[in-house]
From Swiss-Prot:
Main location as per UniProt: mitochondrion
Protein keywords: Acetylation, Mitochondrion, Ribonucleoprotein, Ribosomal protein, Transit peptide
Top-rank taxon: Eukaryota
GO molecular function: structural constituent of ribosome
Entries under Pfam families matching the protein: MRP-L46 (PF11788)
Gene Ontology cellular component list: cell junction; cytosol; mitochondrial inner membrane; mitochondrial large ribosomal subunit; nucleoplasm
Cellular localization per UniProt: Mitochondrion
List of residues that carry N6-acetyllysine: 228
Protein's UniProt name: Large ribosomal subunit protein mL46
Source organism of the structure: Bos taurus
Database matches in InterPro entries: NUDIX_hydrolase-like_dom_sf (IPR015797), Ribosomal_mL46 (IPR040008), Ribosomal_mL46_N (IPR021757), Ribosomal_mL46_NUDIX (IPR033650)
The keyword Transit peptide belongs to this UniProt entry's keyword annotation: yes
Subunit structure: Component of the mitochondrial ribosome large subunit (39S) which comprises a 16S rRNA and about 50 distinct proteins.
Length: 277
């Protein structure tokens, strides 16, 4: 009787030690992770804004797309039911047939809807309508600082900023400040950039990409090795830069035009999260 009892007690003790050891290790790990570090990071954190103006008009159809659209429209017409206007046209034709025969009565005249008159009026309105031009004055002048260009494409905002003693094109950015999230840094960038003239919708709280670079030697001597930039996407809703903003310091570029401004390594990281559908 004593032997089984002893084996049971020893088994419980071993189980307790196995149960206790992970929790003890986890407590030590949490304590070590929570310990503050006295060494400051040599990397500065920045939040960058990828502000896009979405297309304002649809793209031109390719010849194949036009053929497919015509085919689908023809199929829809063949399978569709009569619309209210077509039913009225049939009813009017029936009333006119009655008028030619002896079955027509004077009281039916007030119910006749002159469909042809309506169609003539609609035709006149259609002829007076003039669609807006796809090619704007900014397209003709190649004014890339204007927001009213390439209406059927996505445009990305680029700004010219100082990096050491050089003027470099980049996405708008600002340095992260303690107490704010990186998205709040990007939101602050938008507010200070346009003096609250631009309203945008940010897409998520997580960055869509990042880029790391080292400062020039003159700046690196101050204790910062380089910067880590975290990009946040946003869609432009309303607003534009005021006329007082210095020209030549910002452009609205399409995806193909980014290579005219951005450095190759920076451009490679930006293109990874850009979609031009």
């Amino acid at each position: 009787m004593a032997a089984p009892t002893r084996r049971t007690v020893l088994g419980l003790a071993r189980c307790w030690r196995r149960f206790e050891s992970p929790w003890s290790l986890g407590s030590r790990s949490l304590t070590l992770a929570a310990a503050p570090s006295n060494s400051a990071s040599p990397w500065r954190l920045l939040g960058a804004l990828c502000l896009q103006r979405p297309p304002l008009v649809s793209k031109q159809l390719t010849p194949m797309q036009e053929e497919m659209a015509a085919l689908l429209q023809q199929m829809e017409i063949e399978r569709s039911l009569y619309s209210d206007h077509e039913l009225r046209a049939l009813d009017e034709a029936e009333q006119l047939e009655k008028k030619k025969s002896d079955l027509y009565e004077e009281k039916d005249e007030k119910n006749i809807l002159l469909v042809q008159d309506l169609e003539d009026m609609w035709e006149q309105k259609f002829l007076q309508f003039k669609p807006g031009a796809r090619i704007t004055d900014a397209d003709v002048k190649n004014d890339r600082s204007s927001l009213h260009r390439k209406l059927d494409r996505n445009l990305i905002l680029l700004v010219k900023d100082k990096l050491g003693d050089q003027d470099v094109w980049m996405l708008p950015q600002a340095e992260w400040q303690p107490g704010e999230t990186l998205r709040q840094t990007a939101e602050r960038t938008l507010a200070t950039l346009s003096e609250n003239n631009l309203e945008a919708k940010f897409l998520g709280n997580a960055p869509c990409g990042h880029y790391k670079f080292k400062f020039p030697q003159a700046v690196r001597a101050e204790g910062s090795l380089g910067a880590k930039i975290f990009f946040f996407k946003a869609l432009l809703l309303t607003g534009d830069f005021s006329p007082a903003v210095e020209k030549g310091r910002h452009v609205w570029a399409s995806k193909e035009e980014l290579g005219d401004y951005l450095k190759p390594k920076y451009l490679a990281q930006v293109r990874r999260f850009l979609l031009d559908l």
